[in-house]
Regions:
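Glycan-recognition and processing domains
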Residues: 32-62, 75-82, 135-140, 304-340, ...
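Secretory targeting and sorting signals
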Residues: 1-33
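A domain-level signal for the mature, folded cores of soluble proteins
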Residues: 96, 111-116, 137-229, 241-342, ...
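Structural beta-strand segments of beta-rich domains
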Residues: 53-55, 61-67, 198, 343-347
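Short coil-to-beta strand junction motifs in C2/discoidin
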Residues: 78-88, 139-140, 223-229, 342, ...
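Beta-strand-rich ligand-recognition modules
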Residues: 41-43, 48-52, 70-146, 376-415, ...
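Residue-level detector of short, conserved catalytic/binding motifs and their immediate flanks
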Residues: 65, 88, 122, 198-200, ...
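Extended, charged low-complexity segments
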Residues: 368, 374-474
């Protein structure tokens, strides 16, 4: 969950970071490698068929290490079949710790865990890996920096290793290099029942899910086409040690099961084993891809999980490109249909709501958002496309999208409304109260979020008698 600004600071500061400076030099992994293959100062180039590159560093204490850089791969684009990504295998002192999937020729800020290292000298080795698309020939890593952040040490220590999906539906051990790739991870903490103990929960954003919620419902109910799941939760004591028997993970069918698998240090090994990115704690033999994402970031209180994507804007582009490549986008886009159109035609909105007590029997109410345009205020564009099950019945900060005619801008909007409706048969009469719009934006021509232009705070209660209310006007 690093912002672009923070990535820039990390890259510039290089070795003097987090109170644990590291000495860094880029060099060939083999003495015979040509010097120029290291690129310009502060740049490492990893070539298909070329030698591995190495990055020596010195750790001034024991602890968890993280590597950051901006990554690009000429000729690569997640939107094109045969050019989806380049893959770099990353090892520390000869031990494979993580892989990097590079889905773009444009530089993307990335941060990956390297696992626990001891005090002293170490070497990061980077190799161009199998699973790279045919169009990929080189990966460029600019301003690589290894750091050992003390403030985030506990979260990094217990972060899970996500082993890539290898089996059904594709039977391809490298499938996460072309579909449902892990993009970003973060953690959240809360007090445990035992004084001084904490519970740490880890979540991951994937580029999509090949199963589970269908794409139109994802946009309506979750405000995105990525998949976001919690994957691992554990209790730690006051010294940061794992409390035996407390580790659980999100298993197939969204079950919460005890983790009984293998650890690398304190890092549990979990494998993505379903089409909708649920986990198994037993891995397939010799899986080629593994992801130790930097999970040091967390989510602000009172914000939806999608704020993680907002802080990594490139994730919106990758999500949109996967939809285009997998032919999940209708053409031309039409807000009158339920099918997902060009994601640049959607208003991406986060709002907060609560549901009151039921007064009768029947289904719980959900809330959708509606948008009216200045050009025709009589027409209402709904986030749920008038599908009852696509309104949002969960409480707290939530995200949705509203599909609008191509070319619509925020300046064209006459108003945004909250719309209460039961999600099934009958209506239990519970009121729904909306208290904020936290952000609203369109994607630009490059599928990157524009600055938020829609915010509102207040309190509007929706009832059976008064099921709609205007939240925002320009």
């Amino acid at each position: 969950m690093r912002s672009r600004a923070r990535h820039a600071v990390l890259a510039v500061t290089g070795a003097v970071l987090a109170g644990a400076p590291l000495a860094l030099t880029a060099s060939p992994a083999h003495a015979a490698s040509p010097t120029r293959s290291a690129g310009s100062p502060g740049t490492i180039n990893v070539h298909r068929g070329g030698p591995a590159r190495s990055l020596p560093f010195t750790a001034r204490r024991d602890g968890e290490a993280v590597i950051s850089f901006t990554a690009s791969a000429p000729g690569v684009s997640w939107v094109r079949g045969g050019a989806e990504s380049a893959v770099v295998s990353i090892a520390v002192d000869g031990r494979h710790v993580t892989d990097l999937v590079v889905p773009s020729s444009d530089p993307i800020p990335r941060s990956l865990g390297l696992g626990r290292v001891g005090k002293g000298r170490h070497k990061v080795t980077l190799r161009f890996a199998e699973g790279s698309a045919p169009a990929a020939s080189r990966v460029t890593l600019r301003r690589p920096a290894v750091r050992m952040p003390e403030a985030d040490a506990l979260a990094l220590r217990h972060a899970p290793v996500v082993v890539g999906r290898t089996g059904w539906p594709f039977g391809d051990p490298y499938q996460n290099a072309t579909t449902d790739t892990p993009l970003v991870a973060w953690h959240e903490t809360r007090p445990a029942a035992t004084p001084g103990h904490k519970i740490i929960e880890y979540s991951v954003v994937w580029s999509n899910e090949d199963g589970g919620t269908d794409t139109p419902a994802l946009m309506a109910r979750w405000g995105r086409t990525t998949d976001i799941e919690w994957i691992y939760r554990v209790e730690v004591d006051a010294s940061g040690r794992r409390v035996d028997g407390t580790a659980v993970y999100q298993a197939p069918m969204h079950l919460t099961l005890k983790f009984t698998g293998r650890y690398e240090g304190d890092h549990p090994l979990l494998q993505t084993c379903t089409q909708n990115n649920n986990m198994c704690d037993v891995s397939s033999p010799d899986p080629p891809l593994r992801f130790l994402l930097d999970a040091a970031g967390t989510r602000p209180d009172g914000r939806a999980r999608e704020v993680v994507m907002d802080r990594e804007p490139w994730t919106y582009r990758i999500a949109a490109q996967e939809m285009v490549r997998e032919k999940k986008i209708e053409n031309p886009s039409d807000p009158a249909t339920r099918e997902v159109g060009d994601q640049r035609t959607y208003l991406f909105v986060e709002f907060a709501k609560t549901t009151g007590a039921a007064t009768g029997s029947g289904s719980v109410p959900g809330v959708a958002l509606g948008v009216r345009l200045k050009s025709d205020p009589s027409r209402l564009y709904r986030s749920d496309h008038d599908e009852p099950t696509w309104s949002i019945d969960r409480d707290g900060a939530v995200a949705t999208t509203v599909e609008l005619p191509e070319g619509t801008r925020v300046s064209d909007i006459a108003g945004i409304e909250a719309l209460r409706r039961p999600t099934g048969t009958g209506d239990n009469g519970a009121p729904a109260t909306v208290t904020s719009i936290n952000r609203g934006f369109f994607l630009d021509d490059s599928f990157l979020p524009q600055p938020s232009s829609v915010e509102w705070k207040g309190s509007v209660t929706l009832t059976q008698a008064n099921p709609s209310a205007v939240l925002w006007r320009p």
